[in-house]
């Protein structure tokens, strides 16, 4: 068990929109400072780092940022044994929407049907049957999301620079149910859905037993302790459309002391977090798909002769 006196915590932050400090995070850090923790923070994009010289210098890193640079630096620290909240492996799995969607399905979390591709023209036949939401596979803050209802709207979407996750559009009430979790405590706020809704606080909402169960199941599967979910309340029940580690907790009353308590407990080693190992328990779906099963033709003609010559 660690002693809090003099423990060094480092918050790996992201540039905020608007560019003002998070009141929740400021209050939580003030509480931790009064309890004897030393707090540092920084934004990866605002400094320069020589990767081969980077070494863990804090007792705990709190990964708040979702940017590629922050995740890369976190991976270097993780490889050298740095403790992180949330754990690095949990964050990297959560950030990858393709991996996350498969895990949701594997453990029975209700989530939309989805497809992945790097070529949106391949989704023509799918969008003819249903509206779709197109997301960068490692996006955050709603950046790069498009909603398309027909092939013409699909054709108007710029070609993606990275792979995309294409989700079946789920009709809801027009509001997001934002669910926030700290350990075993679950909170929720409602806000109108929009591309900039992540900047709005929303209004507090009751958490149903079903939503609470879904939220805690996600934390157990991904190994998360501080996280949030976007839920659509469909006619058939709640559906998870996104999962994020260390969200802003906007609109949750008196949340900063609860976050500070959780960070303190983790820093002092009172508990750990670990993603579930599903390799032994996962069962194949009833309708299985093999990767490239139908691709018997070499797709790059100029390589055909070279491959035959190498045999």
Regions found by a protein language model. Give the residues of each.
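Conserved N-proximal alpha/beta basic substrate-recognition cap immediately N-terminal to
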Residues: 15-113, 122
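Extreme N-terminal starter segment of soluble prokaryotic enzymes
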Residues: 4-12
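Short glycine-rich anion-binding loops that position phosphate/pyrophosphate groups of nucleotides
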Residues: 66-68, 138-139, 246
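Rossmann-like NAD(P)H-binding beta-loop-alpha module
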Residues: 112-132
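Phosphate-binding site of ATP-dependent enzymes
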Residues: 143-222
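A long amphipathic alpha-helix within ATP-dependent nucleotide-binding catalytic cores
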Residues: 195-240, 244, 252-284, 288-301, ...
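Protein kinase-like catalytic core scaffold
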Residues: 132, 165, 187-188, 227, ...
